[in-house]
């Protein structure tokens, strides 16, 4: 009924424990799946690669209920190291903090995804610039479902007017998005 009531695309939040029939039903109804690199649908892999996302999907770095990439990077050192070596293909020890170069690399992985849509949280875009991003990466978190005092209280630390004045940054973002 929902699909027939609108001309809008539908996207299903098919994350976590979903019945085995869900992917086939979504595909048959052309409902876009949600593909998150840190939440692979295949239980045999640690990470999903954006290059493997199906066309009928929205590829993103996370949801409002997850840590943004910079905070996630510091959650579990072993997981970060594995991601750095396996998903990024970089050798050596992963930096303790996510650098703008790492954030940009991950964004690029998503931008080249075959997914119909790539929708990235603003926090990830700000992470590519060491001067613009917020110093406290944990302040970028939108929602913590387990904490009734931390819900939807994210506020961007820079105004839109200020961001629009960052010509070099905006040109950089335009170059990154030009591949889509």
Q: What does each model-identified segment do?
A:
Residues 1-180:
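Catalytic cores of glycan-processing enzymes that make or break glycosidic bonds
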């Amino acid at each position: 009924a929902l699909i027939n009531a609108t001309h809008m695309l539908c996207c299903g939040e098919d994350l976590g424990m979903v019945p085995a029939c869900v992917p086939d039903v979504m595909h048959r109804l052309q409902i876009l799946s949600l593909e998150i690199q840190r939440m692979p649908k295949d239980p045999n892999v640690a990470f999903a690669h954006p290059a493997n996302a199906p066309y009928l999907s929205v590829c993103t770095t996370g949801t409002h209920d997850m840590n943004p990439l910079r905070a996630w990077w510091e959650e579990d050192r072993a997981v970060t190291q594995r991601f750095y070596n396996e998903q990024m293909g970089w050798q050596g020890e992963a930096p303790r903090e996510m650098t703008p170069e790492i954030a940009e690399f991950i964004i690029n992985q998503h931008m080249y995804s075959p997914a119909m849509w790539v929708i990235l949280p603003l926090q990830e875009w700000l992470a590519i610039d060491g001067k613009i991003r917020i110093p406290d990466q944990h302040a970028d978190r939108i929602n913590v479902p387990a904490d009734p005092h931390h819900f939807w209280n994210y506020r961007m630390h820079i105004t839109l007017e200020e961001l629009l004045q960052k010509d070099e940054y905006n040109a950089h973002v335009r170059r990154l998005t030009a591949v889509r």
